[in-house]
Amino acid sequence: MDLLAELQWRGLVNQTTDEDGLRKLLNEERVTLYCGFDPTADSLHIGNLAAILTLRRFQQAGHRPIALVGGATGLIGDPSGKKSERTLNAKETVEAWSARIKEQLGRFLDFEADGNPAKIKNNYDWIGPLDVITFLRDVGKHFSVNYMMAKESVQSRIETGISFTEFSYMMLQAYDFLRLYETEGCRLQIGGSDQWGNITAGLELIRKTKGEARAFGLTIPLVTKADGTKFGKTESGTIWLDKEKTSPYEFYQFWINTDDRDVIRYLKYFTFLSKEEIEALEQELREAPEKRAAQKALAEEVTKLVHGEEALRQAIRISEALFSGDIANLTAAEIEQGFKDVPSFVHEGGDVPLVELLVSAGISPSKRQAREDIQSGAIYVNGERLQDVGAILTAEHRLEGRFTVIRRGKKKYYLIRYA
């Protein structure tokens, strides 16, 4: 199976500008390709992951990827897929975000590869120094307003309105493609399905300025969920690639909770498991869905890719401890991750009666209820049931001297922190 056929099997090809021509090029030459990532926050998120991993697939097949950070285009704002005008971010903010995103992209590509090392570029390097007259003469002259108005990203905003700033975005992205075509020999741009208009604008600019049509575009489909909710969002917010914004445990849990209807598709999109391995997991899903083998494989592969082997091991340990109730063996760092979103209470002072702590931490509404909860066996301290109403929590109940985890009933967790 050639590269394009594999991408199609994985469901990673939405549209191509010339499928036969692209297949021939990829099979016969080492191709330089790029994908752009605008800094719209201080981290990339899992909505960016399919594109990042597609760059990696191209590199593994012998091609040369360029990850382009949109230090300039991020100052303008892409209207594609947006119902209203974006808020313009300060230059200093975009610069800081660009640096963070550059560092994240660096984890997925090989910059030392023999013959096809990856590169990271920032389009501010060539758009920043560009003066308005040069831009209008060398780029703007090649775009008719009629052509631009016909693009979906503009059409969808005709009613609500679009600023000239966002209207001109596609010309800047087109200029990126031309610039990389000239300086890096870049022949292919990939991007999400919402980027089709911007990618074809780049091909048009190359054709008009160079008099040749030797470049290609490929888009990746929008990742969807069978239940209709937005991929990459949970009740607690966006799933980020930065471990400070989304812990490896939360990240792992996101994937382990994948719907049966989505999991095989996601294995194809987000892992490097072979066709045979994925088909075996698909068969197991049909025969024994309760084992959730496909979800476990997905969570392990993607967490390892994004956060590394050690973070994956921690995420599994936390998940198993929460499932079994065996909290006492977790480290303070693992407790911090696993109980990030549970109610917490800071206890100032030394030893404290359990009844008193349950009330002051808001775990039980009254001392009477606290005593009833303890006697009925509903209270667990660090995973162990305590049924002594006279129990006093001492230093030995503090995990690494910092935390006590209290559970009331089957699933209500509380984290006690010590000042």
Swiss-Prot record:
Motif segment ('HIGH' region): 39-48
Residues where L-tyrosine binds: 34, 169, 173
Motif ('KMSKS' region): 230-234
E.C. no: 6.1.1.1
Reaction equation(s) it catalyzes: tRNA(Tyr) + L-tyrosine + ATP = L-tyrosyl-tRNA(Tyr) + AMP + diphosphate + H(+)
SMART domains listed in its UniProt record: S4
Gene Ontology CC: cytosol
Keywords: Aminoacyl-tRNA synthetase, ATP-binding, Cytoplasm, Ligase, Nucleotide-binding, Protein biosynthesis, RNA-binding
Annotated transmembrane regions: none
All residue ranges annotated as the S4 RNA-binding domain in the record: 352-419
One family name in Pfam for this protein: tRNA-synt_1b
Residues noted as binding ATP in the record, renumbered to the chain: 233
Coiled-coil annotated spans: none
Example GO BP: tyrosyl-tRNA aminoacylation
Molecular function in Gene Ontology: ATP binding; RNA binding; tyrosine-tRNA ligase activity
Function comment: Catalyzes the attachment of tyrosine to tRNA(Tyr) in a two-step reaction: tyrosine is first activated by ATP to form Tyr-AMP and then transferred to the acceptor end of tRNA(Tyr).
Family indicated by similarity: Belongs to the class-I aminoacyl-tRNA synthetase family. TyrS type 1 subfamily.
PANTHER family: TYROSINE--TRNA LIGASE, MITOCHONDRIAL, TYROSYL-TRNA SYNTHETASE
Protein name: Tyrosine--tRNA ligase
Natural source organism: Geobacillus kaustophilus (strain HTA426)
Source organism phylogeny: Bacteria, Bacillati, Bacillota, Bacilli, Bacillales
